[in-house]
Regions:
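Aromatic-rich peripheral "rim/lid" segments of glycoside hydrolase catalytic domains that contact
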Residues: 335, 349-366, 373, 442-449, ...
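Aromatic-lined carbohydrate-recognition surfaces of secreted/lumenal glycan-active proteins
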Residues: 230-234, 368-407, 459-461, 515-519
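Amphipathic, heptad-repeat alpha-helical segments
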Residues: 40-74, 114-175
Length: 561
C-alpha cells in the first residue's frame, strides 16, 4: 500500500501537510499550523517561549516546525503552540494547567527525533496574562529526559535486574553533562552545549536500559507459546507462490490478509459491488497458509481513509452505512468464519481515517454493530481494534487524513477507552508501530500506557526503511535523504535489522503483547521505503530476515517455566 497519504504521515515527517522545515541555525518564521478553537471563550494567559540554541555541527535542519502540547497523562490537546522567530511559544493551553511540549529535535550522535520536555516531570504552567517566560529548549529537553531516566531506572531494577556497566556509563555521562548545563544556566549557549551532549547520552541510556531489561525478562519468563510472529501476506500474489510460502513460513506463524475496498492492486477485488463479496483470492491464500500451520487475520474491511474508499462509500448516508456494514460483516464472517484466527473490526477510526466525518457517537455505534455481528456469526474468531499514529500528533493539526476535523479528536488511547467504556467487548487492542519518530523508551512507555486499558495487545503493523538498494538506486525509486538521520545512523540493511531486533525484543518481553507484525515482506512492494525483509520477489534475504529468524529461534529454545 505504498503511496498512501496516511502512511506518508509517518514516513515523511510523522505528520501530514505540515509544510517546510526550520533552518539549521536560524529560526524562520513559520505559518501557524493551528486552527482556531471552536470555543469562543478566551483562555489565553501569559507566554512561555522555548528558545532553541543550534549547537549542532551539521547542516540541519535541526528543528521541525510542528510542536504540540500534551497533558500530565501524555495526551495531546489542541493549543496555540507555534514556531516563530522567538522559538517555540505557547500562551493558550485551553485550561490545561500542567503540560509538556513535544518537538522534533536533531540530536547528533543519536537521531532527529521527537522528544517531550516536561520540566523534569513537574510540567509547565503558563504565567499570568501579560507576563512572559523564556526557557532554554536544549536545557529543558535534557533535564526532562535525564530526570525521567532516574525514575525509570529505579522502576526497572525492582524485579532484580542489575544494569550493566554500559547502561550506567550512559546514565552517568548524561547526569554529568546535565549538571554542567545547570551550572551554566545563565550562559545560554554554553548551557545549551552541555545540555545537548547530556541529551544525546540520556537517549542512549533510555534505549540501552529498556532493551537490556527486556532481554532479562525474556530469560526470566522462559518460553512463550502465546506470541505470534506475523507479517502482511500480500506477497503471495507478488512472487512465485511456493517461494513465498517457503520463505514466509520459515520466520512467521501469523499472516495479515488485506480486505481493503480500494487501492491495493490485486487485493482490491474483494467487493464487486457495494457489500457483494468475491472471496476466492483470499480463500486460496488463507488455505495455503493454514496448510503450513500459519494462522490468519482479516484486515482493512472497514478503513475509511481517503486513499481507500470508493466514491459510492464516500457518499453513503449514515443509515445506509450501517446496513452496508452489517451485511458485509455478516457475509464475510459466514464465509471465512473459523478459517480466521482474528477479524479487524475497524482500522484507524480514532479520528484519523475518518473521511466520512462520523461523530464520536456514530463511530461508537458503527464499531459496536460490526463487533456484535462478527461475534454472533463467528464467536470463535477474535475481534480486534487497530489504531495508528500512536502519539496522535494529528490532534494539533486539527485534521483527518485529508480534511479539516469537524469534531474534537481523540488519541488511540482515548478512543479505545471510550469504546471500552461504551461496553464494546472486542478481544485484542492493536497498535501500529511504524518507525514512530521516537526513541525505543518512548515507544515502550506508550505501549505500557495502552496496556492499562486491560486488553491483550498486538503490534499490528511494524516497520522501518531498509535504506538504498541496488534496485532503488538503479531505478531512482528512493531518493537519498538530505536530512539528518532519524535513528542512530542512516537507514541501511543493518540499521533496519537493529531496529527490528530491538522492537521485537521489547514486544516479546511484555506479557500483555501477543504478536508483532512486520510490514512488508518483499521489496519493492513496500510501504516504508525498502522496508521489506526480502530484496526482491526472487527471494534474496535481507539482514533483517536473518536477524528475525535468529531471535525467534533463540526464544523458541528457552526452557518452559
Amino acid at each position: 500500500m505504498s503511496g498512501l497519504s496516511r502512511r506518508k504521515f509517518i514516513k515523511s515527517s510523522a505528520i501530514a501537510g505540515a509544510g517546510t522545515f526550520l533552518a539549521s541555525n536560524t529560526m524562520l518564521a513559520a505559518p501557524e499550523l493551528l486552527l482556531k478553537s471552536k470555543v469562543n471563550k478566551n483562555t489565553s494567559l501569559g507566554e512561555i517561549v522555548f528558545v532553541p540554541h543550534y549547537v549542532q555541527k551539521g547542516r540541519g535542519p535541526h528543528l521541525y516546525e510542528l510542536a504540540w502540547a500534551t497533558d500530565k497523562e501524555w495526551e495531546p490537546f489542541l493549543s496555540n503552540i507555534k514556531m516563530d522567530a522567538k522559538g517555540v511559544s505557547i500562551s493558550d493551553s485551553k485550561n490545561i494547567d500542567k503540560f509538556g511540549i513535544n518537538v522534533r529535535w536533531n540530536v547528533e550522535g543519536f537521531g532527529w527525533t521527537n522528544i517531550t520536555a516536561d520540566n523534569g516531570g513537574e510540567f509547565y504552567s503558563l504565567p499570568s496574562s501579560g507576563k512572559s517566560q523564556s526557557l532554554n529548549l536544549n536545557y529543558e529537553l535534557c533535564k526532562s529526559r535525564v530526570v525521567r531516566n532516574r525514575h525509570r531506572l529505579s522502576d526497572l531494577k525492582k524485579s532484580g535486574w542489575i544494569p550493566s556497566a554500559e547502561v550506567m556509563m550512559y546514565v552517568n555521562l548524561s547526569e554529568q553533562f546535565y549538571e554542567d548545563a545547570r551550572q551554566k544556566i545563565n550562559d545560554d549557549f554554553n548551557s545549551a552545549n552541555f545540555a545537548q551532549s547530556g541529551l544525546m547520552y540520556a537517549l542512549w541510556a533510555s534505549e540501552k536500559m529498556e532493551v537490556e531489561k527486556a532481554k532479562f525478562d525474556i530469560v526470566l519468563r522462559g518460553k512463550r507459546d502465546d506470541f505470534f510472529f506475523g507479517c502482511d501476506a500480500r506477497s503471495f500474489y507478488q512472487m512465485y507462490q511456493d517461494t513465498f510460502l517457503d520463505l514466509f513460513s520459515e520466520v512467521f506463524n501469523y499472516a495479515n490478509i488485506t480486505f481493503v475496498a480500494k487501492g491495493d492492486g490485486i487485493m482490491s477485488d474483494y467487493q464487486t459491488a457495494p457489500g457483494v463479496i468475491q472471496p476466492e483470492t483470499r480463500e486460496l491464500l488463507i488455505k495455503k497458509l493454514n496448510e503450513r500451520g500459519i494462522k490468519s487475520q482479516e484486515r482493512l474491511l472497514f478503513w475509511f481513509h481517503d486513499c481507500c474508499i470508493p466514491d459510492w462509500l464516500r457518499d453513503m448516508k449514515y443509515d445506509d452505512l450501517l446496513k452496508y456494514a452489517e451485511k458485509l460483516t455478516k457475509d464475510t464472517m459466514k464465509h471465512f468464519g473459523d478459517m480466521l484466527y482474528a477479524m479487524e473490526v475497524v482500522n484507524e477510526l480514532h479520528d484519523w481515517a475518518n473521511e466520512l466525518q462520523l461523530s464520536p457517537e456514530q463511530i461508537t455505534e458503527l464499531t459496536r454493530l460490526i463487533n456484535d455481528v462478527a461475534k454472533s456469526v463467528a464467536p470463535n474468531v477474535k475481534r480486534t481494534i487497530n489504531n495508528c499514529c500512536p502519539y496522535a500528533e494529528y490532534v494539533q493539526m486539527n485534521s483527518y487524513s485529508k480534511k479539516k476535523a469537524v469534531f474534537p479528536q481523540r488519541s488511540p488511547f482515548k478512543f479505545t477507552k471510550d469504546i471500552i467504556d461504551a461496553g464494546i467487548d472486542f478481544d485484542i487492542l492493536e497498535q501500529q508501530m511504524y518507525y514512530p519518530y521516537r526513541d525505543l523508551q518512548d515507544s515502550i512507555l506508550l505501549l505500557e500506557k495502552l496496556s492499562t486499558l486491560g486488553k491483550p495487545m498486538q503490534l499490528s503493523e511494524v516497520g522501518v526503511p531498509g535504506g538504498p538498494s541496488n534496485y532503488s538506486v538503479r531505478n531512482s525509486t528512493v531518493p537519498f535523504s538530505k536530512e539528518p538521520y532519524l535513528w542512530h545512523k542512516p537507514w541501511n540493511e543493518h540499521t533496519q535489522a537493529d531496529w527490528l531486533e530491538d522492537i521485537y525484543t521489547l514486544a516479546f518481553s511484555k506479557p500483555f503483547i501477543h504478536a508483532s507484525n512486520w510490514f512488508d515482506f518483499v521489496d519493492p512492494y513496500y510501504f516504508m521505503e525498502n522496508g521489506g525483509l526480502l530484496q526482491s520477489p526472487k527471494g534474496e534475504k535481507k539482514e533483517a530476515y536473518h536477524r528475525l529468524k535468529k531471535i525467534r529461534n533463540n526464544w523458541d529454545q528457552l526452557p518452559r517455566k
